[in-house]
Structure formats: C-alpha cells, structure tokens
Amino acid sequence: MKAQKKDLIEKIAKYPDRYIGLFRPTKPKAKILQNLLQSNEIRFGDALEILFEKYFEQLGFLILEKRIGSGKEYLDLDQIFKNNNTIYFIEQKVRDDHDSTKKRGQISNFEKKINALLKIYKEKDLKCYTYFVDPGLIKNKKYYTQELNKIHSDYNVFTQLCYGKELWEEICHPEIWEELLDYLKRWKIEIPDMPSINFDEDAKNTFEEIKDLDVSIFRKLFNNKEICNEILPILFPENKVLKLLNKYFKEKINEGSIYKTLSNKVMEIISKGQGASPNIR
C-alpha cells in the first residue's frame, strides 16, 4: 500500500480537526486507525485494477488508452482492451454496496463513458461491463440490470453486469478467477489483523516515504501544538523518524531558511519528549 503514511501525514497537517478536538467522538488513535483502514480499502481496489490489467495483458489482449475525451473534460476508464476486433470496456468496483445516490452516480458515469467511447469506436465493436469483483455482496443487482438494459436499448451497444467469476467466464478465462482466489487466500494469512500506527517500527522506509512532502506540510504539522502533543507521540513514539527528518532538514539548510526552521522545530519536539511515549488521551 504505497504512500499510505505520506497521505496520512498530509491529511493530519491539512485537516487536524478531523483527528483532534473536543467535538470528535473518537480519540486520535482510533481516528488514525479508521483512516488507515479506509485507505487500505481504497488502495485494495486500485491494486486489483492494476492486477487485472496485467492479467489481460498476459492473456494477449491489447491494452488501450484509459484516458479519453477532449478539451476540458477527460474521463478515466478502469479497464479497456482489445481482443480480436472487439473493444472491452469494464467499469470495475470491489463490491456492490452503494447507497441510492452512489448507485445512480455509478450508472450516470458508466453511460457518460460509453457515450465518449462511441465517438471513437463503432457500436458493434464495443462490449461494456459493470463489474463487481466481490461476488459475496450483491445489493443493487436488480437496479443495475434494469439500467444496463436501458443503455443497451438506447445506444444499441452490448452491456453486461458481472460479479466475481462471471467476467472471466465472459472472456473465456475462468482459470484466472481461481488463481486470484488462491492468491487472496494466501495474502489474507500474511497481512496483520490491524495496520500498525507506530511508524517508528519501520523508521527508514517511513522517512523515505514522507521526507519529500512539501515544506508547508511539515510547517503546519510542527507548528500545531495539538498535533505535536496528541498525534506525533502516537505515530513516532521512539523519535526515530523525527531524528531522521531532523538530519535531513539540517543537510538542506543551504537550500533555504525554512529547513533550519523545520530542524529547530523537530529538535524542540524531540527535546520536550513529545514523541517519547504514546499519548492516547
């Protein structure tokens, strides 16, 4: 899950009130965990998109440009590839758990992309799928089926709703689904029950991930007393990452006074012991 720590630090610096304050129903530690878990869900979906594209490529399909449109409006497709003379467009989501507003937005977005594709490809050459990877949650199947049928009727283009293995059966490679299930079962055994919020456990990699954040982010982070008192002790309980950042800022002092300012701020935090032990008030 690349850049997860970097994204979290940036969010804390920009929106500290989401993590601290009297009017939050959770303590900072719980909010950080919640943020990381939500981030994992999003990044898992992104990873599946990349993985599936690799599978399509290995199967010999021609991967096409995912960004389509012109002028000020561009649309990004989840999957699009060519097999023989057929163009496959797939709108891919992990699970069918959308509420009424999101499911309507999903269909609207799907139609908009089909409309854009029809300006590039012929109706008869297109096969368009709404695909939910997880077959265990089928919340809006009736709605999506009805809406896809309407799109098929109005645009005269092939549309299909698929869950889990169904997509791979559509492209005549069900063995890929079985391989994916086997991989996921092994992966689930390896991953921890909960993500670690002690970034000092992997200090070097954490430092490498966050060191190039904009200096304005670090400035916001280190100038906020509540963040320094309530958040940094949770993320950096042993000061390992903070010490690496301090060394890094000192090495860059010749590039601007802001780096001296940041170095002084970090040294102040370390010397006060605000990162010495987790504070989970």
Model regions and ranges:
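Active-site beta-strand-loop-beta-strand hairpin of nuclease catalytic cores
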Residues: 73, 80-90
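Short secondary-structure capping micro-motifs at structural edges
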Residues: 39, 67, 75-78, 113-118
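Secondary-structure boundary elements
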Residues: 58-62, 83-86, 119-126
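Secondary-structure boundary/capping motif
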Residues: 66-68, 89-93
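Interdomain/boundary linker segments immediately adjacent to catalytic/signaling cores
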Residues: 1-59
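Non-catalytic C-terminal interaction segments of nucleic acid-processing enzymes
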Residues: 150-281
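A short acidic/basic microdomain associated with nuclease active sites
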Residues: 53-73, 79
